[in-house]
Amino acid sequence: MYAEIEKRTDKHSVYELCSIYGVSRSGYYKWLKRAGQPNRYEKTYKILDNYVLDIHSHHPMMGYRQIRDKLCLEFGWIVSDPTVWKSMKRLGIHGFTRRRKAAVSGSNLEHIRYSNLLNRKFKAEQPMQKIVTDVTYIKHHGKWYYLAGYMDLFNNEIVEWELSDKFDNFLVMKPAERLLKRKMSTEHQILLHSDQGVQYSSAGYCNLLKEYNVVQSMSRAGNPLDNAVMESFWGRFKDTLHKHFHYWESNDLSATIEQAAYYFNYERPVRKLKGKPPVLFRTELVA
């Protein structure tokens, strides 16, 4: 409106134009004085954009929700998801999105089955109450590797993992034993959930869990949603390995996976954890 008045001042007086547009002359002159200077909203957006760009430069895989959580956690900025989304749009940046993978039915091989005691109740009230595990695969320098992971459902922390070029029972037993030895002081019984893979139903693995008084739970055949949290995590993890850590350039795949696991445990905000990374959420709770 003030800009329209400015355009017509060569033919009409300011008094006439302000009367026509229904604004005060003092308002017009204040606008004229600060013309070309950003208002307080524009200044705020500029500061926000700088913060968003800084976070994006360090964590290019983060979407607007995670950047919003990090703004709140690290810089004390209380902003909405749409505000951060608009900031990213202004800057022409975006996080990485993951393509959904079609569900694959399970094997029909006969093997030992355990009941689905977890029953898609993915919320845990305390650490080491509910653990989920799964195996995924990664091709590196023309060779297939297998990665077994164990996640604590209390805070989505990867508490153990094992990388091997052999798809055998030791792939899941080694990290399980390390985890259970560390957590021998846990007073409550642990529920450990997996799919019906032959490694998880092997005598050695089942006996190991019994030795530590762990309750074993398994997904139903052909129901990947019974272990949805872990299945979903592997998708995000491998996308991050590819798009941020560029694992194919590394000569040490294990070291790269360790870096990515550190990122997910110590740096990546999780919305259900009040925007905090898993380890920070756990340590603040027990402190």
Locate predicted features:
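Active-site beta-loop-alpha junctions of metal-dependent nucleic acid enzymes
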Residues: E162-S185
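C-terminal domain-tail junction helix/linker
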Residues: A203-C206, K210-V214, G235-A287
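Residue-level signal for the short linker/turn that defines the boundary of a DNA-recognition helix
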Residues: H12-S13, M62, V79, W248
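An active-site-proximal beta-strand-loop segment
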Residues: R120-V159, D165
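RNase H-like polynucleotidyl transferase catalytic core
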Residues: T97-A103, L192-Q196, K210-V229, F245-S250
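Mobile genetic element proteins and their domesticated derivatives, centered on retroelements
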Residues: C18, Y28, V52, I67, ...
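Short, amphipathic alpha-helical "recognition" segments used to contact nucleic acids or chromatin
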Residues: M1-H12, D49, L53-H58
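Basic, flexible linker segments flanking DNA-binding modules
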Residues: C18, R25-Q126, N223, P277-L285
